């Protein structure tokens, strides 16, 4: 018989840096999950990813307090900021441009995010990433 799902918990946790402090501890603690077990499993799964990069994770908590989790790719905005070498996007993206990214960088980000995005092809995903770049005040060259 299949386990009964008690809850889905969505978090963004830094790769390789999960620990029982907020936001992980309170979110999982109220579901009755063994927090250290999750932290060890998450850190082991994300050890190949650049340390500190925020990784979205969906944790499925079952009624017997066991859990499974699925990691996603980092948000497009984070990857764009890293590619452009900036700390944050523009507060007024239509007026103030804060950096530049090339089409090659946009393609690389689109290919990285391909598993999580619903676009039909790489070109459609690239347009989506370009839209995110424009809304952050980045100029796409090429």
Swiss-Prot record:
<dbReference type="InterPro" id="IPR020785">
    <property type="entry name" value="Ribosomal_uL11_CS"/>
</dbReference>
<comment type="similarity">
    <text>Belongs to the universal ribosomal protein uL11 family.</text>
</comment>
<keyword id="KW-0687">Ribonucleoprotein</keyword>
<dbReference type="GO" id="GO:0003735">
    <property type="term" value="F:structural constituent of ribosome"/>
</dbReference>
<keyword id="KW-0488">Methylation</keyword>
<dbReference type="InterPro" id="IPR020784">
    <property type="entry name" value="Ribosomal_uL11_N"/>
</dbReference>
<dbReference type="InterPro" id="IPR006519">
    <property type="entry name" value="Ribosomal_uL11_bac-typ"/>
</dbReference>
<comment type="function">
    <text>Forms part of the ribosomal stalk which helps the ribosome interact with GTP-bound translation factors.</text>
</comment>
<dbReference type="InterPro" id="IPR036769">
    <property type="entry name" value="Ribosomal_uL11_C_sf"/>
</dbReference>
<dbReference type="GO" id="GO:0070180">
    <property type="term" value="F:large ribosomal subunit rRNA binding"/>
</dbReference>
<dbReference type="InterPro" id="IPR020783">
    <property type="entry name" value="Ribosomal_uL11_C"/>
</dbReference>
<dbReference type="Pfam" id="PF00298">
    <property type="entry name" value="Ribosomal_L11"/>
</dbReference>
<dbReference type="GO" id="GO:0006412">
    <property type="term" value="P:translation"/>
</dbReference>
<keyword id="KW-0699">rRNA-binding</keyword>
<protein>
    <recommendedName>
        <fullName>Large ribosomal subunit protein uL11</fullName>
    </recommendedName>
</protein>
<dbReference type="InterPro" id="IPR000911">
    <property type="entry name" value="Ribosomal_uL11"/>
</dbReference>
<dbReference type="InterPro" id="IPR036796">
    <property type="entry name" value="Ribosomal_uL11_N_sf"/>
</dbReference>
<dbReference type="GO" id="GO:0022625">
    <property type="term" value="C:cytosolic large ribosomal subunit"/>
</dbReference>
<dbReference type="Pfam" id="PF03946">
    <property type="entry name" value="Ribosomal_L11_N"/>
</dbReference>
<keyword id="KW-0689">Ribosomal protein</keyword>
<comment type="subunit">
    <text>Part of the ribosomal stalk of the 50S ribosomal subunit. Interacts with L10 and the large rRNA to form the base of the stalk. L10 forms an elongated spine to which L12 dimers bind in a sequential fashion forming a multimeric L10(L12)X complex.</text>
</comment>
<keyword id="KW-0694">RNA-binding</keyword>
């Amino acid at each position: 018989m299949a386990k009964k799902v008690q809850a889905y918990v969505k978090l963004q946790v830094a790769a390789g840096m999960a620990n029982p402090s907020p936001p992980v501890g309170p979110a999982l603690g109220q579901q009755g999950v063994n927090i250290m077990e999750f932290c060890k499993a998450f850190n082991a799964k994300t050890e190949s990813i650049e340390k500190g990069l925020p990784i979205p994770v969906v944790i499925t908590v079952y009624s017997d307090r066991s859990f499974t989790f699925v990691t996603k790719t980092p948000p497009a905005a984070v990857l764009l900021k890293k590619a452009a070498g900036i700390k944050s996007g523009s507060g007024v993206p239509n007026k103030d441009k804060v950096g530049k990214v090339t089409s090659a960088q946009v393609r690389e980000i689109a290919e990285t995010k391909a598993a999580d995005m619903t676009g039909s092809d790489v070109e459609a995903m690239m347009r989506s990433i370009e839209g995110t770049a424009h809304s952050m005040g980045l100029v796409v060259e090429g």
